[in-house]
Amino acid sequence: KASMSIFDSTSLLSRINRGETDSLDEHIIYNLRLAERFSRLSEGHYDVTVKPLVDAWGFAGHEAERTPNLDSLLQFVGYRRVHIRDGRLVKDDPRVQLDFNSIAKGYTVDLVAALMERCGAKNYLVEIGGECRCQGVSSKGIPWRIGIETPFDGNMSDGAYLTGRIRMSEGGLATSGNYRRFYRDAAGNKISHTIDPTTGRSVTSVSYTHLRAHETEADLV
């Protein structure tokens, strides 16, 4: 949803991050509460307050800092530092910033799927940026076949190199990895866009694929 964009300087989330407003809409409230649940389940390894770290490492449109001061940044990263009170966001520290990029596509997929079901669709496949949700069967009358990309560095060819395919008739699927959005620092270390909020550093896992009943949750996991 547009209100959760960190790339649009006029979005509600961008204004919240700049401290210009503490008002929340239904989309941010829903996703913040869902994110908090997964933050607790993951013991903080998933956390939407990760934005200062994402910025410091040079993702989300920012230039990477030569040597990010992780100890300093981690002081205002943590899901326990934000609270919802009467429809407004309360931050324990004004420097806390939110980034819903890890959940926004999956959430949008779920919204589109819900709209299709309200319109009477029994068979559909919704896909946005690699996140998908399906129900029923394809036009061939068989379960949907969803390809899982081979995770080698620089694989930018959608569907050209696949590890395998999954047959699905219901549910959401999300794949995330470090083989597309990454760079190498001066020492040759690979820095991926997936940041562990507990350490402040990028993760080394190559690729994950998750299946859930709803795409928003698959995206989160």
Feature names for model-found ranges:
Residues 1-215, 221:
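Mature catalytic core of soluble alpha/beta enzymes
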